[in-house]
Regions:
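Charge-dense, helix-prone N-terminal extensions
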Residues: 1-145
Length: 145
């Protein structure tokens, strides 16, 4: 069985039970990430890689599970997600419940709708992935205890 995807950390969410299914998922997930950051969104790939690395560094039990349009981070449930929003911006979605948002943390309306992701931070440059982003990622992790 393969243990990494896209040259990154080998920690991915609870994969399907059978080895063949895991390998198929890993093949598909790698292609989904490639497709997500292809064409006009190719310039976002360094931001994605930095967010993935930092998200997985929060704790040993954090896992990522790429889908066709997002890359969610899990503990027990989704705690955050990487979403290429435009050709120049990634939205880092966060599961923060009814947390009151300071200016940089944008409410998504998700809490009122019962969605898991309730806030987002706009990421347009590597410098945007700073200590504040890490604090919010760690807060989302802690809320999923």
């Amino acid at each position: 069985m393969r243990t990494s995807i896209y040259g990154h950390h080998p920690s991915f969410a609870k994969l399907p039970g059978k080895a063949g299914e895991r390998d198929t998922y890993l093949d598909n997930a790698e292609q989904w990430v490639e497709d997500m950051f292809a064409g006009s969104k190719a310039g976002l790939k360094p931001l994605y890689r930095a967010l993935l690395e930092r998200g997985l560094s929060i704790a040993k039990d954090v896992q990522a599970c790429p889908c066709r349009t997002i890359v969610p981070f899990y503990r027990h449930h989704v705690i955050a997600q990487i979403k290429p929003a435009t050709r120049t911006r990634i939205d880092l979605g966060l599961a923060l419940g009814d947390t009151k948002a300071p200016k940089r943390l944008i409410e998504t309306g998700g809490f009122e709708k019962g969605d898991r992701i309730t806030h987002r931070i706009e990421i347009t440059a590597l410098k945007d992935i700073d200590a504040e982003v890490m604090r919010w990622l760690k807060r989302a992790y802690a809320l999923d205890a």
